[in-house]
Amino acid sequence: MKTSINYLPEQKRDDLRRIVECVLEVLPDCEMIILYGSYARNTYVDYDQRIEYGIRTCFMSDYDILVVTNTRFQRYIINHILSKATDNYYKGKNRYASTTVQFIDESIDDLNKAIDKNRYFYTDIKREGIMLYNSGRYKLARRRKLNYREIKELAEEYYNDRFERANDFLRNAMYDKNDERYKICSFHLHQACEN
C-alpha cells in the first residue's frame, strides 16, 4: 500500500495530517488510517460549478477515510467517536467551504477477512489506498485466489443484496410515477440502475 501524499497540494496534505491527529485524539486504539477514493487515486475534484438544465450545481470531492481499530465497536459508539473527530477537524474552518470528511470503520479482523475473501471494495482500498497512519501492530491480509465455489457464493451474495435494493428503488419509482412526482421518480430509477 502507498504511503506518500506528496502529490497533493500542501493545503490538502495539512488537512489529512489534521484528520489523522483528530482521529488519534478520540480513538486511542486506532490501528490504521487509510485514505481511499478520489484523493488516493489523484482524481479528486477540488471544486466544480456548472449550470445544467438551468440549475446551478457544484461538486467537491470529499476525503474518504477508513479507520481501522483492533476491536469491533457498536455502530452508534464508533459513529459518535468519529463525529467528535470530525467536529475537532472543522474547528476554526468554514465547514461549508472546506473539503468534507467521510469516515468508515472496520476492525482489523473484519478488514482482513474481507481482503482474504476478495471483497472488491476492500481489495480496491488496499490496492489504491494510502496509509496515513499505521500503529505497526497489525498487517493487512493478502488477497488470495478464490476457488469456483467461493466465487459463486460471493457473486450470489452481491446479487441478492443489490437486486433487493434495486427492487426497493424501482418500487418507490413506481409509486412516485403514479403520484406524478417525476423528479423523485427519476432519482429512484437512477438508484435502481446503479444498484
Give names to the regions the model predicted.
Residues 185-195:
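Hydrophobic alpha-helical packing segments in soluble, helical-rich domains
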Residues 2-11, 88-171:
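Conserved NTP/Mg2+-binding pocket subregion across the NTase superfamily
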Residues 170, 177-178:
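Hydrophobic/aromatic side-chain positions at a characteristic register within alpha-helices
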Residues 2-26, 46, 53-115:
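Metal-dependent nucleotidyltransferase catalytic core
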Residues 31-45, 49-52:
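Short gly/ser-rich loop at a beta-strand->alpha-helix junction or flexible surface loop bordering the NTP-binding
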